[in-house]
């Protein structure tokens, strides 16, 4: 891929994004060596990508199971539109929920949570059921955990 006029991203930007997704702690100098750019040129590209909202954050990837949150679930909730705002506020403060998606289909929201055990899950469901019917799926295993995005090669 050379230059994508829709996104304004060129091949070097994609390579930079690829490297940062693999290790966001790499120094400008290390990135520059891999990209054959000077550290200031790397910094300029990163700043431009940040300003355009392409790079939103630099984060650590936490193993929730190592923190005692080994039960991972998806919760689907049917919420009446008049209650969306209250529901969203409740979700923001509910322990264990780390994703909330407003979706199409029979459900209104799909949540992803990590809790300690079945008792913790039951308490969470009891809080959510006040907003409407819930359906829960326990994640038994994960076949694909892709957090690394790359462009389709032409």
Which functions belong to the PLM regions below?
Residues 1-154:
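A compositional/biophysical signature of low hydrophobicity enriched in polar/charged and small residues
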């Amino acid at each position: 891929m050379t230059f994508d006029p829709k996104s304004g991203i060129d091949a070097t930007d994609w390579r930079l994004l690829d490297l940062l997704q693999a290790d966001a702690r790499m120094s400008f100098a290390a990135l520059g060596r891999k990209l054959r750019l000077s550290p200031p040129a790397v910094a300029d590209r990163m700043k431009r990508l940040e300003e355009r909202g392409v790079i939103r954050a630099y984060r650590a990837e936490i193993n929730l199971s190592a923190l005692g949150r080994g039960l991972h679930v998806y919760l689907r909730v049917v919420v009446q539109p008049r209650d969306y705002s209250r529901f969203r506020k409740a979700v923001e403060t509910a322990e264990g929920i780390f994703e909330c998606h407003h979706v199409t289909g029979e459900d209104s929201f799909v949540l992803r949570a990590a809790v300690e055990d079945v008792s913790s899950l039951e308490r969470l469901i009891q809080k959510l059921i006040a907003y409407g019917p819930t359906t829960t799926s326990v994640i038994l295993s994960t076949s694909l955990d892709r957090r690394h995005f790359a462009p389709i090669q032409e």
